[in-house]
């Protein structure tokens, strides 16, 4: 979130992490003329999406000059004083990426470190996340949680629904469980949305399906 504090648009940027947030920011900054390089340990970004959609997204991002360094691990990040390009990102493969800024998109962490959870009988994991049951109740029967603080998928649409269900359960309002198939919205350019399982997941589970394609 510190990216919003930039005083001016950088000339170049290294984005570490090709997840949802990384892809969103990379495409936005690239369209504003920033030289963007993405680094991720995985061979394919956004692996939970249909591969055909991912391939098309990567193709379009390359068209706006985004460079992908996939299957690469960051060894260290250093800053240089009084240099025009102030950040050096060294990869374990020996490559060095030099840019004005580096944006680390390593997933959302729960903002719970200052809440003194122990006083309420709660304990967060190393990323500040709480454990809840299917009704979003924590270890304490009178405390409920939803959204980024309980982990995956940590998206706006799902967090809103989790919050609604948690509030209903807390006040004894009868509601059903969280839907198994929830909508996913990714605000990249172009935008991506999906609901349900991806094609490769259905194939792995030997579930018959049909494919329809509409281009627009």
Enumerate the predicted regions with their spans.
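General small-molecule cofactor/ligand-binding pocket signal
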Residues: 67-69, 144, 210-212
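Structured beta-strand/loop patches that form or line metal/cofactor-binding pockets in enzymes
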Residues: 193-216
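Rossmann-like dinucleotide-binding cores of NAD(P)H-dependent redox enzymes
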Residues: 4-5, 10-14, 20-88, 93, ...
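FAD-site-proximal beta/loop scaffold in flavoenzymes
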Residues: 1-10, 96-171
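Short loop/edge segments at beta-strand edges and connector loops
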Residues: 1, 70-72, 78, 126, ...
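Glycine-rich beta-alpha junction loops
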Residues: 43, 103-108, 148, 183-190, ...
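Proline- and acidic/polar-enriched loop/turn elements at helix boundaries
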Residues: 41, 73-74, 115, 129, ...
């Amino acid at each position: 979130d510190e990216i919003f504090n930039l005083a001016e648009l950088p000339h170049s940027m290294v984005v570490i992490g090709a997840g949802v947030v990384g892809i969103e920011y990379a495409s936005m900054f690239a369209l504003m003329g920033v030289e963007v390089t993405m680094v991720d340990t995985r061979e394919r970004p956004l692996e939970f999406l249909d591969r055909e959609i991912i391939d098309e997204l990567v193709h379009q991002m390359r068209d706006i000059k985004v460079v992908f360094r996939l299957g690469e691990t960051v060894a260290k990040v250093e800053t240089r004083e009084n240099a025009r390009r102030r950040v050096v990102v060294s990869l374990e493969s020996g490559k060095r990426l030099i840019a004005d800024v580096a944006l680390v998109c390593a997933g959302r962490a729960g903002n719970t470190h200052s809440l003194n959870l122990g006083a309420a009988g709660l304990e967060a994991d190393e990323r500040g996340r709480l454990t809840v049951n299917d009704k979003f109740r924590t270890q304490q029967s009178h405390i409920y949680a939803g959204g980024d603080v309980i982990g995956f998928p940590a998206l706006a649409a799902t967090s809103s629904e989790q919050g609604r269900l948690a509030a209903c359960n807390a006040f004894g309002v009868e509601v059903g469980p969280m839907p198994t198939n929830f909508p996913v919205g990714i605000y990249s350019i172009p935008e991506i949305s999906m609901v349900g399982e991806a094609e490769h997941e259905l194939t792995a589970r030997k579930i018959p399906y049909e494919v329809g394609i509409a281009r627009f």
